[in-house]
């Protein structure tokens, strides 16, 4: 029942706001939300993309399996996705289903 964290684990609360880069190491956005499935496992991350200083940003959903988490040379968490800025700009905008509780 009791749990001890493992060295390679991350706290979900610390993922919000984490920078997201593409494979060319271009910053493409940041993490706005984390979506859990019915079993409590991470299904997707909602990324804020395309904005500047919080203006004009839109949200897209990216499956958790398509994201990679690594540490930079300073030990900071960086999330990466194999996508171009153009493909993310063309991604459908995420909208929460407001009928769900």
Residues of each region from the PLM?
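Peripheral interaction segments used for macromolecular assembly
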Residues: 1-101
């Amino acid at each position: 029942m009791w749990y001890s964290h493992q060295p390679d684990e991350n706290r979900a609360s610390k993922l919000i706001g984490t920078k997201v880069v593409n494979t060319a190491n271009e910053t493409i956005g940041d993490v706005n939300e984390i979506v859990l499935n019915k079993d409590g496992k991470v299904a997707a991350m909602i990324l804020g993309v395309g904005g500047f200083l919080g203006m004009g940003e839109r949200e897209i959903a990216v499956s958790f399996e398509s994201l990679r988490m690594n540490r930079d040379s300073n030990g900071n968490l960086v999330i990466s996705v194999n996508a171009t800025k153009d493909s993310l700009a063309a991604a459908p905008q995420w909208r929460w289903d407001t009928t769900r509780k």
